[in-house]
């Protein structure tokens, strides 16, 4: 499976405006775009002129799925551009403590990694969306097979953190949960732009394209 040249899942995009919304979009979505908040790329089949995006609000239930014209993109922030950032508001939250603790072991892997989810949104926008019970969502780019022993060691490292860590391995087949791969399951769920796949090896191209 070839890597997409344009925006990829978990990228944050700037440039979407209320004018790009359908008439039935919720008022809070329009307000978020007026405020200049980024939108996040979601998984969906490729479209030549648009990218599937999600808009988030301050409330947990405020999530909206839509489409953004590719021509409207003014800036693209990938998850790995956020890993070394500090939040604009220095709040002593478990997720931020975990991020600081994990930078060294993640950097030591020699692979690109970054922050996604609410933490990534807050790092990119400066809007405080995390709370004391928030998870820390991470992405690790693994274009080549990631040894299960390494995955298990990383998972054990996460268990020492003050909050739940949800790391996704970005493989040729799509996103795979680190926990599933580390636990040695015979097949793991790979989330790609099309339907999710249960695969023995998400790095084996023949299996991915079958």
UniProtKB/Swiss-Prot annotation:
The record's comment on protein family reads: Belongs to the MdcG family.
- Which reaction is catalysed here? apo-[malonate decarboxylase ACP] + 2'-(5''-triphospho-alpha-D-ribosyl)-3'-dephospho-CoA = holo-[malonate decarboxylase ACP] + diphosphate
Q: Which keywords accompany this UniProt record?
A: Nucleotidyltransferase, Transferase
EC no. given is 2.7.7.66
Its domain of life reads Bacteria
Q: One Pfam family of this protein, by short name? A: MdcG
Enzyme class (EC, first level): transferase
Task: Tell me the function of this protein.
Answer: Transfers 2'-(5-triphosphoribosyl)-3'-dephosphocoenzyme-A to the apo-[acyl-carrier-protein] of the malonate decarboxylase to yield holo-[acyl-carrier-protein].
Q: Which InterPro entries match?
A: Holo-ACP_synthase, MdcG_C, MdcG_N
> Under which name does UniProt file this protein?
Phosphoribosyl-dephospho-CoA transferase
Give GO MF terms, alphabetically: nucleotidyltransferase activity
Active site positions, chain numbering: 135, 137
The species is Pseudomonas aeruginosa (strain ATCC 15692 / DSM 22644 / CIP 104116 / JCM 14847 / LMG 12228 / 1C / PRS 101 / PAO1)
Q: Does the keyword Transferase apply?
A: yes
Keyword Plastid carried by entry: no
């Amino acid at each position: 499976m070839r890597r997409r040249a344009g925006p990829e899942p978990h990228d944050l995009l700037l440039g979407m405006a209320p004018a790009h919304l359908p008439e039935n979009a919720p008022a809070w979505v329009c307000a978020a775009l007026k405020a200049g908040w980024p939108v996040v790329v979601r998984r969906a089949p490729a479209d030549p002129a648009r990218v599937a995006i999600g808009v988030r609000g301050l409330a947990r239930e405020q999530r909206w799925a839509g489409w953004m014209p590719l021509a409207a993109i003014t800036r693209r922030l990938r998850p790995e551009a956020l890993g070394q950032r500090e939040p604009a508001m220095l709040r002593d939250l478990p997720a931020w403590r975990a991020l600081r603790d994990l930078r060294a072991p993640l950097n030591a892997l020699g692979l690109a990694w970054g922050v996604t989810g609410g933490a990534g949104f807050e790092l990119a926008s400066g809007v405080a969306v995390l709370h004391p019970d928030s998870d820390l969502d991470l992405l690790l780019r693994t274009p080549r097979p990631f040894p299960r022993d390494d995955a298990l060691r990383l998972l054990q490292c996460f268990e020492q953190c003050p909050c739940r860590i949800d790391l996704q391995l970005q493989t040729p087949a799509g996103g795979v949960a680190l926990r599933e791969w580390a636990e040695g399951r015979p097949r793991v769920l790979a989330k790609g732009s099309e339907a999710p796949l249960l695969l023995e090896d998400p790095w084996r191209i023949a299996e991915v394209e079958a």
